[in-house]
């Protein structure tokens, strides 16, 4: 990352934190992955039950490995050996003390956009876990809500499709086909425009993370 890009992220990050707090999110800006990991861990009480949705950003800063190694009651869907066990773990995550996730996009006015196939991730963001910790790189930030929704649909979803390898049109074309296939990963689009009692804690990272 160039020095100019770092300054750009730092300045936008400071403004976005202010705008998120105006919407009653708990928000933090960390310049590096290392700072973000330290901040995220400081928000999780020892002994908490902790689960997560699919979250490359959490993985990239080392948060998932740190939680697995820490003094927490971990609901690890990635350790499940069968699809039935995985589905059960995903349901248990909805009642976790702490739920970890990323964001597909954020708008500079402080709104968060997430797109989901199964719906477990957006469900946990809306209700269930006592707190939600969101890790998001500054590459996820767009100037306005329309651009954030567009990013979720035309950037995040097609890139995640490459990871999943499902037979959806965007896997072949690299762009959203507005599909209605059974394997569609864009069944739910969630806009979180306001947060109750700082339940959602957003850790912004001044680096490019996730998709």
Predicted regions and their residues:
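N-terminal start-of-chain detector that recognizes signal peptides
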Residues: 1-2, 21-24, 71-74, 85-87, ...
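Glycine- and acidic-residue-enriched helix-capping/strand-helix junction motifs
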Residues: 1-9
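Conserved phosphate- and dinucleotide-binding cores of soluble alpha/beta proteins
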Residues: 94-211
């Amino acid at each position: 990352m160039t020095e100019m890009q770092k300054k750009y992220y730092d300045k936008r990050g400071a403004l976005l934190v202010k705008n998120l707090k105006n919407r009653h999110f708990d928000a933090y800006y960390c310049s590096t992955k290392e700072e973000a990991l330290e901040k995220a861990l400081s928000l999780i009480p020892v002994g908490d039950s902790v689960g997560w949705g699919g979250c490359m950003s959490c993985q990239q800063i080392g948060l998932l490995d740190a939680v697995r190694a820490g003094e927490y009651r971990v609901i690890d869907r990635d350790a499940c050996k069968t699809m039935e066990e995985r589905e059960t773990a995903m349901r248990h995550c909805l009642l976790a003390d702490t739920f970890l996730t990323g964001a597909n996009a954020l708008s500079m006015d402080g709104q968060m956009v997430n797109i989901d196939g199964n719906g477990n991730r957006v469900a946990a963001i809306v209700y269930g876990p006592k707190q939600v910790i969101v890790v998001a790189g500054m590459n996820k930030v767009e100037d306005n809500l329309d651009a954030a929704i567009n990013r979720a649909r035309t950037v995040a979803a097609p890139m995640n499709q490459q990871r999943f390898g499902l037979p959806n049109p965007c896997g072949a074309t690299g762009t959203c086909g507005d599909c209605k296939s059974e394997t569609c990963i864009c069944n739910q689009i969630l806009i979180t425009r306001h947060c109750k009692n700082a339940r959602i804690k957003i850790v912004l990272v001044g680096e490019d993370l996730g998709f």
